[in-house]
Amino acid sequence: VYLQLFILEKEINLLMNLDEHWYVLLTIRSKEEEVCKYLIENEGIFAFSPKMEFYHRVSKQIQLRTLFGGYVFVVSKLSQVEVDRIFRKFPLESVFIHELKYKEDISALTDEEIRILTMLMDDKKILRMSYGVLLNNKIHVTRGPLVNMDDYIIKYDKHNRLATLNLNFLNQIWKVGVTLIE
């Protein structure tokens, strides 16, 4: 019941923000935060590079890394023309940015992709570690953002504690952190 209420709350928040437009920028890997910093300085723009928690074997700690390397997500109530103007004024010539679009004027993110992204990430735009157990050689998530998404897990790497998800998102394969509870 709690999960259903949580999903419903996220859906309502998404519907309340229908006047927001989502954009996807492609940039150089490792320059995502630099691009976000510039974009956030512009009024009416929220930019982020999603992160994910993962288990680092050497340090034996949960750490953060970029979920989609080279991608920056922008949310704004500004029009496409206004946002394009801000993108074109990007001051750092050494950092390449390119807006991804399906067609001339259609953002590269579908409503379904936006819904998935907002459901899985927390308010800090981090996909938190999930926890689960093995049942019949298949992982069953009991805690975390992947609860009730067992059917989307197509592979589990026990050694690195990473699950591969069968989600269509920017033609990327989702590898997310899942730790087995012993």
Question: Where are these predicted regions, by residue range?
Answer:
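Short, surface-exposed secondary-structure boundary micro-motifs
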Residues: 144-145
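Short beta-strand-centered aromatic/proline hotspots
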Residues: 149-155
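Acidic-enriched and Gly/Ser
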Residues: 2, 8-135, 155, 164-182
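A generic structural signal for beta-strand entry/edge sites
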Residues: 160-162
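Generic structural signal for buried aliphatic residues
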Residues: 137-139
